[in-house]
From Swiss-Prot:
One of its GO terms (biological process) is Gram-negative-bacterium-type cell outer membrane assembly. Disruption phenotype: Essential, it cannot be deleted. LptH depletion affects cell envelope stability, and almost completely abrogates the ability to cause infection in a G.mellonella model of infection and in a mouse model of pulmonary infection. Belongs to the LptA family. Coiled coil: none annotated. Keywords: Periplasm, Signal, Transport. The gene is lptH. It comes from Pseudomonas aeruginosa (strain ATCC 15692 / DSM 22644 / CIP 104116 / JCM 14847 / LMG 12228 / 1C / PRS 101 / PAO1). This is Lipopolysaccharide export system protein LptH. Involved in the assembly of lipopolysaccharide (LPS). Required for the translocation of LPS from the inner membrane to the outer membrane. May form a bridge between the inner membrane and the outer membrane, via interactions with LptC and LptD, thereby facilitating LPS transfer across the periplasm. Binds LPS. Important for cell envelope stability and essential for growth, cell viability and ability to cause infection in different animal models.
């Protein structure tokens, strides 16, 4: 465990969350990032930061929670993957002032920064403007706003679901 020279990991966290704000409120990027946890282990040599114990990461309208949140950096010191594990882990973001908060749940939530991709694994659920998507695994492309839901092949799941369950609300007609 090392606590020396932790600024690259902290700046990396800022970059990771800041880039996920592309679909969040415009003011979110300018907000400070706050990490609350019972403990933190920062290893600059390996490029890994692990936060444990009721972890809450917030920036503006974006919130990520879990029992454990891990950040991994690439060789250049940029955050590559943010992983939250919980019972369940939780992610929320307000995409626009006139939109409802998008909520996402999963026993594991992975955010692949450079790929603009959020992966929810095991008991995965997304709630967006009254629509719900549930399944073993949900992959959300934050840049293209595409949701893929299905089986979590190659992953052990606690509650196998052979099928996805989606509820899509009818569009409201303009009056």
């Amino acid at each position: 465990m090392r606590f020396v020279n932790t600024l690259p990991l902290i700046f990396g966290l800022t970059a990771a969350l800041g880039s996920s704000m592309a679909l969040a409120l415009p003011s979110d990027r300018e907000q400070p990032i706050r990490v609350q946890a019972d403990s933190a282990e920062l290893d600059d040599k390996q490029g890994v930061a692990v936060y444990r114990g009721d972890v809450v990461v917030t920036q503006g309208s974006t919130k990520l929670t879990g029992n454990t949140v891990t950040l991994k950096q690439d060789k250049n010191g940029d955050i590559e993957v943010v992983t939250s594990v919980g019972k369940p882990a939780y992610y929320e973001q307000k995409p626009a002032p006139d939109k409802d908060v998008t909520k996402a749940y999963g026993l594991t939530i992975q955010y692949f920064v450079t790929q603009n991709r959020v992966v929810l694994i095991d008991q995965a659920k997304v709630i967006q403007e009254g629509n719900t998507f549930e399944g073993e695994k949900i992959v959300y492309d934050t840049q293209r706003q595409i949701v893929n839901a299905g089986r979590a092949t190659g992953s052990q799941v606690t509650s196998p679901r052979p099928r996805i369950d989606m509820v899509i609300q009818p569009k409201k007609k303009a009056q």
